[in-house]
Structure formats: C-alpha cells, structure tokens
Amino acid sequence: MNAPHMNDTTADAATLDATAAPAGRPALTRREQKDAYENNKLFKRIVRQVGQAIGDFNMIEQGDKVMVCLSGGKDSYAMLDVLLRLRERAPIDFDIVAVNLDQKQPGFPEHVLPEYLKQVGVPFHIENQDTYSIVKRLVPEGKTTCSLCSRLRRGILYRVAGELGATKIALGHHRDDIVQTLLLNMFYGGKLKGMPPKLQSDDGKNIVIRPLAYVKETDLEKYAELREFPIIPCNLCGSQPNLKRAEMKALIREWDKRFPGRVENMFNALAKVVPSHLMDTTLYPFQSLRASGVADPQGDIAFDEEPCASGDDTAAPGGAQPISIVQFDDL
C-alpha cells in the first residue's frame, strides 16, 4: 500500500488561531499576534513538506515500524516531533520507536533524551557503544573523525533496527544537507551524487528514509527554538574546524542571502535529471546514438536565450529575477 500525502489534513487540523490569547490572559499585542502567526505558518510549512516527502517517495507504509534515529540535535528532534503529529491524523497506521546511540563521548548528558522521550510518551531504546574511544584511537590527532564515526554508527544502527523489528530507519537530514552532499561530491569526489530521500542501506537489509528532505535548515532552527527542544551539542565532530561540509554550508547560506531561489533550483534539479545531456555512458547510449529525425523535447532548446533570461540570478537590481520552481516553498 502506497503512503498517501499526509500533509493537508494534518496541517489544517494543527492550525491554531494565531491571534487568540489563552483564557484569563490579556489580548495579545500586535507583535505577539505577528509572532504567533509566523510560528503557525512555520509549523504548517514543515508539516506540509514532511507529509509531501513521505508521499512522494512512499517513505512510510501501512504497518511500518519506523525507527527514528535521535541524536539530540535540532534536526532529529524536529523529525520525531513532526512524525508524531503526522501519525495522529495519518490515513495509515504505523509505529514509531526512537533510538539513540550513546557513543560515550565525554560530557554527554545521558539523562536528557530518556527524560524527554518519557515526557512525550515515545517508546525508545538507548544503545550504549563506546565508538568514541575507537575513533580517538584510530584517527590521528588533527584529522576529521566524521568518516569513521559515521561508518561505525551506521553499522550499529542497522543491527539495532533488525533487533527491534524496524521496517524503516528515519534519519534527520534536511534539504541543505542534500545540496551540501551534492556539492561535496562534485567538488571533491568528481561525481554527480547526492543524498536520496529514500534508499536501501549498505547491508541491503534496511530501508533508510529522510522525511525532512524538503525542509530548509533555517526553518528547523526556528522550529527547534520555538519548541524548546533540549539540544545536546556534538563535541566530537561538530566542533572540528575546517570541515569541508561546513564550507559547503557557509556557501549555501551565502547563496540564500545573495541569490534567492538559487539553492531551491539546485535542489529541484536533483529530480529533473537529463541523462542525454550529461556524460555518463552507462546512463545513456551515446555510442549507438543516431539521428532519428524526431526533435528531442529535452534538447538544446533549454539553453536558448529566452527561457534563460528570466532565470539569471546575476542580473542587476531591477532586472530579471530568478524564478523559484520549488512547489513546496510557497508561503
């Protein structure tokens, strides 16, 4: 059974009167009304985008047991929070279990996540594995630990998913993570490869989903602040300087400010691939290509002057502006 879009009814049901004050309190000021209105828009937008991503990629199906990987960061908190709200009104039934991998990093507050998960009433499992010592022993001082740490973490989470009977593993990567991965692979890996919203795991035994695939990181930052999640900072990899991913993050933030629409268009391009206009001979039969006498609808007309003129994000102020073609960012 395919997972239908779960965004419309849930977002509408969750909508509150943004200008109404609680009983017994004075009427909201104009500033408070504006803040409440913007917060409500933010919540509706995130719920809609998550619901759309789930439907577009059939991420969650009837009877699924979704293992939500909770790190203690803003993204995984938001993912769990929105999935719980979506489940309340979803047209399908599915279970959620939250899983945290305690890697025994110094200073990690072990009590925070269990207390939070008990408070929200979510079944959870804390997996205790000292990967921190392994990483510190094997990675030379001054080198980034992300690669080894990620491999160790993936293997453990795949095993835990099997032990818990989970049918889907949900990770908290968002739109910006996906674009960053695309740029990293292009700039440093020499390949066109991103971070798919849904994929088969490395071991071939699990399906990994990314429900936040359509959500901007800035929206998640605002949402985490609004919901007051008990954020746990990562003092292993998050504090390492000069990480290439951090460079990509800064680049994307700068583009968002200077060229509105550019990052959205890059993200949208991942779903509009034209193999005949790339160079991968495994994706398109260039060697056997012959003139057919039939025009290619995806041919070089895409580079003619007229359609490009309105999408030039380097145009001077007052000139042509970039066209946002991302359907989920219309608020």
Swiss-Prot record:
Keywords: 4Fe-4S, ATP-binding, Cytoplasm, Iron, Iron-sulfur, Magnesium, Metal-binding, Nucleotide-binding, RNA-binding, Transferase, tRNA processing, tRNA-binding. Residues 8-23 have a biased composition (Low complexity). GO terms for molecular function: 4 iron, 4 sulfur cluster binding; ATP binding; magnesium ion binding; sulfurtransferase activity; tRNA binding. One of its GO terms (biological process) is tRNA thio-modification. [4Fe-4S] cluster binds at C146, C149, C237. Residues 1-31 are annotated as: Disordered. A motif (PP-loop motif) lies at residues 71-76. Pathway: tRNA modification. GO terms for cellular component: cytoplasm. It is found in: Cytoplasm. It is an enzyme of class 2 (transferase). Its cofactor is Mg(2+); [4Fe-4S] cluster. It catalyses: cytidine(32) in tRNA + S-sulfanyl-L-cysteinyl-[cysteine desulfurase] + AH2 + ATP = 2-thiocytidine(32) in tRNA + L-cysteinyl-[cysteine desulfurase] + A + AMP + diphosphate + H(+). Its main location: cytoplasm. InterPro entries: Rossmann-like_a/b/a_fold, TilS/TtcA_N, tRNA_Cyd_32_2_STrfase. Binds 1 [4Fe-4S] cluster per subunit. The cluster is chelated by three Cys residues, the fourth Fe has a free coordination site that may bind a sulfur atom transferred from the persulfide of IscS. Homodimer. Belongs to the TtcA family. This is tRNA-cytidine(32) 2-sulfurtransferase. It comes from Burkholderia lata (strain ATCC 17760 / DSM 23089 / LMG 22485 / NCIMB 9086 / R18194 / 383).
